[in-house]
C-alpha cells in the first residue's frame, strides 16, 4: 500500500486516523465475537437438553404405542393416528442476538384431546396420541434451537474472519504506510536541513568576502 499513497503530512494524519478506526473496529468485533461465543455455548446446552428431551419423549411415546396396540384394536390405533395428521401451527418470530437474526418459536398449547373418529378407543391409545403430540413439540424445539446454534456459529466464523483481516492485513498495512510516510518526510527534512546549511554557508562565505574586500579597500585609501 505504501507505493500507492502520497507521502505528505496530511496523508500521515489520515493514516493515523485510519489506524485508530481499524483498531477500534477490531476491538468491537472481538467483543461481539466473545459475546457470541458465550451465547453459542449456552445454546449448545439448550440443544443437548432438547435432544435429550426428544429422545425421552420418543421412547415414552413408542412405549405408549406398543401398549395401545396390545390393548386396543388396530382400527382404533389407526383412527387416532390419522386424527393427528393435520396442520401443526407454530408462532414463529425473528429476534436479534447481537445482530444475528434467529427464529424464536412459540409452541402453542395442544388440545387436551385430539379429534378422532367415533370408534371406541381405550385410554392407552389416547395416551399414545398425546405422547406423540409431545414428540412433535420436542422436534420443533430441537429444530429451533439447532437453527439458532447454526446461525450463531456462522456469525462467529464470519466475525473471526473480519477480525483476522483487520489484525493481519489492514492494520499491518496501515503501519507500513505510516512508516513509509515518516521515512520520506524524515528524508525530506534531512535534505532540507542540509540544503539550508549549504545556503547559509554560502551566504556567510559571500559576506566574509565582502567584509574582506571592504577592509582591503579601507586600508588602501588610508595608505594614499
Swiss-Prot record:
InterPro entries: V_ATPase_D. It holds the Pfam family ATP-synt_D. Keywords: ATP synthesis, Hydrogen ion transport, Ion transport, Transport. GO terms for biological process: proton motive force-driven plasma membrane ATP synthesis. Gene3D superfamilies: 1.10.287.3240. Residues 190-224 are annotated as: Disordered. Residues 201-212 have a biased composition (Basic and acidic residues). One of its GO terms (cellular component) is proton-transporting V-type ATPase complex. One of its GO terms (molecular function) is proton-transporting ATPase activity, rotational mechanism. It comes from the Bacteria. Belongs to the V-ATPase D subunit family. Produces ATP from ADP in the presence of a proton gradient across the membrane. This is V-type ATP synthase subunit D.
Amino acid at each position: 500500500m505504501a507505493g500507492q499513497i502520497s507521502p505528505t503530512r496530511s496523508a500521515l494524519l489520515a493514516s493515523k486516523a485510519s489506524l485508530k478506526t481499524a483498531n477500534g473496529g477490531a476491538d468491537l468485533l472481538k467483543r461481539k465475537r466473545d459475546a457470541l461465543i458465550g451465547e453459542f455455548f449456552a445454546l449448545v446446552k439448550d440443544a443437548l437438553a432438547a435432544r435429550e428431551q426428544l429422545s425421552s419423549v420418543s421412547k415414552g411415546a413408542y412405549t405408549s404405542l406398543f401398549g395401545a396396540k396390545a390393548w386396543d384394536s388396530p382400527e382404533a390405533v389407526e383412527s387416532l393416528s390419522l386424527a393427528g395428521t393435520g396442520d401443526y401451527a407454530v408462532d414463529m418470530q425473528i429476534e436479534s442476538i447481537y445482530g444475528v437474526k434467529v427464529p424464536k418459536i412459540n409452541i402453542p398449547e395442544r388440545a387436551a384431546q385430539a379429534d378422532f373418529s367415533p370408534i371406541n378407543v381405550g385410554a392407552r391409545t389416547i395416551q399414545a396420541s398425546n405422547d406423540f403430540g409431545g414428540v412433535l413439540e420436542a422436534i420443533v424445539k430441537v429444530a429451533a434451537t439447532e437453527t439458532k446454534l447454526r446461525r450463531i456459529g456462522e456469525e462467529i466464523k464470519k466475525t473471526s474472519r473480519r477480525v483476522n483481516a483487520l489484525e493481519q492485513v489492514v492494520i499491518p498495512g496501515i503501519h507500513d504506510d505510516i512508516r513509509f510516510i515518516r521515512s520520506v518526510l524524515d528524508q525530506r527534512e534531512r535534505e532540507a536541513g542540509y540544503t539550508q546549511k549549504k545556503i547559509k554557508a554560502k551566504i556567510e562565505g559571500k559576506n566574509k568576502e565582502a567584509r574582506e574586500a571592504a577592509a582591503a579597500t579601507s586600508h588602501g585609501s588610508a595608505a594614499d
